[in-house]
Amino acid sequence: MTSTGQDSSTRQRKSRHNPQSPLQESSATLKRGGKKCAVPHSSPNLAEVKKKGKMKKLSQPAEEDLVVGLQGLDLNPETRVPVGTGLVFDEQLNDFHCLWDDSFPESPERLHAIREQLILEGLLGRCVSFQARFAEKEELMLVHSLEYIDLMETTQYMNEGELRVLAETYDSVYLHPNSYSCACLATGSVLRLVDALMGAEIRNGMAVIRPPGHHAQHNLMDGYCMFNHLAVAARYAQKKHRIQRVLIVDWDVHHGQGTQFIFDQDPSVLYFSIHRYEHGRFWPHLKASNWSTIGFGQGQGYTINVPWNQTGMRDADYIAAFLHILLPVASEFQPQLVLVAAGFDALHGDPKGEMAATPAGFAHLTHLLMGLAGGKLILSLEGGYNLRALAKGVSASLHTLLGDPCPMLESCVVPCASAQTSIYCTLEALEPFWEVLERSVETQEEDEVEEAVLEEEEEEGGWEATALPMDTWPLLQNRTGLVYDEKMMSHCNLWDNHHPETPQRILRIMCHLEEVGLAARCLILPARPALDSELLTCHSAEYVEHLRTTEKMKTRDLHREGANFDSIYICPSTFACAKLATGAACRLVEAVLSGEVLNGIAVVRPPGHHAEPNAACGFCFFNSVAVAARHAQIIAGRALRILIVDWDVHHGNGTQHIFEDDPSVLYVSLHRYDRGTFFPMGDEGASSQVGRDAGIGFTVNVPWNGPRMGDADYLAAWHRLVLPIAYEFNPELVLISAGFDAAQGDPLGGCQVTPEGYAHLTHLLMGLAGGRIILILEGGYNLASISESMAACTHSLLGDPPPQLTLLRPPQSGALVSISEVIQVHRKYWRSLRLMKMEDKEECSSSRLVIKKLPPTASPVSAKEMTTPKGKVPEESVRKTIAALPGKESTLGQAKSKMAKAVLAQGQSSEQAAKGTTLDLATSKETVGGATTDLWASAAAPENFPNQTTSVEALGETEPTPPASHTNKQTTGASPLQGVTAQQSLQLGVLSTLELSREAEEAHDSEEGLLGEAAGGQDMNSLMLTQGFGDFNTQDVFYAVTPLSWCPHLMAVCPIPAAGLDVSQPCKTCGTVQENWVCLTCYQVYCSRYVNAHMVCHHEASEHPLVLSCVDLSTWCYVCQAYVHHEDLQDVKNAAHQNKFGEDMPHSH
């Protein structure tokens, strides 16, 4: 799938390759018999490429995708990068307030406080100011109905009593004679920034406006909001500037249901909201605010909700949601514009949000978003009601937009258990729709650390903000330092002029940096040789002295000396050049730590990361990065926390060995491994190598076991693994072993990372360590690709936004396997990799509904095409009249409820199937606003139908406050019918066929239909379903439960006992025969969790993972929390079938 495939291909993943069992790491270290300069043989030759090309005929859809993708390419390297941050701040927006309540939180004082803070920090003068303008009525009509706009316009002429009467017909709003004009001005302010941004007048922007807008719906005021500014801006950008894909990020503490309802059928707008939910107890009390609501119809998968179910959520929780969910999906969606509903009511001290985020945290969120859409980013103020916190939050985000480094986070950057659960559930709901979210075999085995210890760690690591920290923002004259010396070209191969590690490497890089004007933007720093004392921090004195003797050796002796090492050549200048390269890195460290520059690049050679304490290796003599790290710690006078990221395609064995017992240095390497056959050979680069002694867990190896790894694979590793660990480590300095031999065209690497990809990797790391980051050149042997790649990284260091990644394919399955393998290894060391606790997983994973997506339209869906009502809205219909549904909440495992929802959804999930039904999706959305509806509870109580729907464009179904004992139970599975009322569902004529009256209600209340563990307890008549709904084969395929095709715990299955298998045995503990399971390790029989839960107790005591149902012969893995169907289970299943039915199983698949 290409990056532009959102407009022409289905969002449902086309194929799900079964992940293979990862090979066991070899315990023996392979001898390094191969040479580093050997060319990998896995790449196809020219003849194969030509043959393959002739066999592939470009289809029309693929050609259209290619054309759209090429539109994003910039073939002119000297194109001017837009500069400046736009700001709209108009005093007229303070011309309204609540006439009857002076204490109303949405007040003019909010903007006054912001303005004072921006003046205090000198930010107003650094921005490009734009005059606010009024939005035209035609522009508002891109989202809102004309009748609603006209109604709002009449408020200009109402007196206070009339305004109050009208305001009371809505939820949480007030009206003032100037409310309409200010709302128009607020919307127009955002549109002005859109024009400036798309016209390359600015790089990004912020609209400091009021009233807020994200709760406003098509024809409904709500939650202080009259017009939905960002929704109008998205439609405006699509119409005027031909933007095809817009990302809207809503980090306001309240769910922006208005924005969600406007776009929940539209695949051209991706909506992401992270908000306080508390299982529906927090405003706006909607099921549509939960993780299970993902949009419907063509927009299924394009609505993302991350609900916080407790207060006090911190920066770490928000950052984790961005890393694990938003950034991966956005990288596949590839937005062309990012709009942020920037509410700051999640900051510590806000009376409404009751969260514990800090201004620095919002600076980091802003920075992460600046890597998307080529940097085209607009923040629009929404909520925030603690004046001091609001002002600090706005200023922090504005600092980041202006290019200032993100402050270091003071709290422990580890998400809490509740956040991990919410993130996991959201991922579960979204995984079928986004290829980048596909998780390979990522087992959820219990960590070796006891659960009690983990909980104690969380308690000890808990952080509670007592006050907003006074963030400091460094003012630097020079942002990026550059160190280079042509003397390093003196190191050369006297016997082979075509050796890949050629002196031309650094010369070509410098020439390119000068050609594109980047060198002139940097502060040129003089290189110096490393001192012996600096070298001795990482290398032995004997080795240094031995290398020094090569300066006076004869040519024949130099050749013999080089042969003593692995992949090494030596000339008389080698020792001096190696000292100069290492000293240059140390000089750059001095400049960064002293504040002379913020970050820097060292264009040096020979490279260093293979150099061992006592030996040269792989073109390397002195380990420049390692020496620079030790030099930084000496300057600081303490064990400075240093992150070393090594993205050279070869594993940095030398760096790993130097720091493998040091917890002050986190070493992360991404490299080709090919199961130990890629240089430097052996098992040092395996994922199982995690360090030793005090440094255990601080060595992280991401081994690629094949070629062609590209941008998508590296970004997946960044999002899932590198950045979560890095944020938890919270480094004070970042050093990058910047080898570019994983770049496209490199003769040694065989990978496909683009210069743009390296720019993104650099940008994402720049949020760490207060922006103190240094790139030190390692490998890279294609002169063109290393020059362009280093230039791309330099652009990022200078603050230029990373370019869009065009034609980005999904991550390779082999890459996902490697990443998952590393995550499994390091979960015990890094809490940020434990997405959720085991006992919470069942909430999300049981009976997950999967519906094939419709092919999205190539153009955005207009508001009129979706939900525009006909006729004027009567005044009494404006009032929100939502009533909680009667009946119980549907639990996750209820087979009848889930199957019925699946079948009902089946009739509505495709345009072809919809032809035979009287249900209109647009009408249904007008009625319930896209909220989730429990159809079974509705069908069971038809007398309540009139009270279960809302007025036109109402908020949707409210979430009733659950009893205390049920606060952790949530409804699952967003159906495509998330806007259908119970009354309208009767139009399908199927409920009568299923006879779902009191019988359905009884089935709903019983636990016999639960699919959690014992599918054998299900008593649903599938034939009745078939008769009621026709042949499913003619419609979209759906699955109530999809078993795993492989499980890492299959090795726990033991041979069938000699006495055979008796599935009629009673439970060993209680003697029941009602519903039992047999353990496939010890073959003892116990009852299910829905009888007396003795099999659950057996699993907890024995840790035996796999069990077989004596009822329906299904196999369940307690550790994976999923059903498993694999050929290794066929023998035991067949034996059980023979015992139960007296014959072999009818089929073996």
Swiss-Prot record:
Residues with the Phosphoserine modification: S21, S43, S975, S1148
Pfam (any one): zf-UBP
Entry keyword annotation includes Transmembrane helix: no
Essential cofactor(s): Zn(2+)
Region listing for Histone deacetylase 1, in residue ranges: 87-403
Phosphothreonine found at: T958, T961, T967, T971
Major site of localization recorded for this protein: cytoplasm
GO biological process: actin filament organization; aggresome assembly; axonal transport of mitochondrion; cellular response to hydrogen peroxide; cellular response to misfolded protein; cellular response to parathyroid hormone stimulus; cilium disassembly; collateral sprouting
Posttranslational mods: Phosphorylated by AURKA; phosphorylation increases HDAC6-mediated deacetylation of alpha-tubulin and subsequent disassembly of cilia. Ubiquitinated. Its polyubiquitination however does not lead to its degradation.
Name of the protein in question: Protein deacetylase HDAC6
Organism encoding this protein: Mus musculus (Mouse)
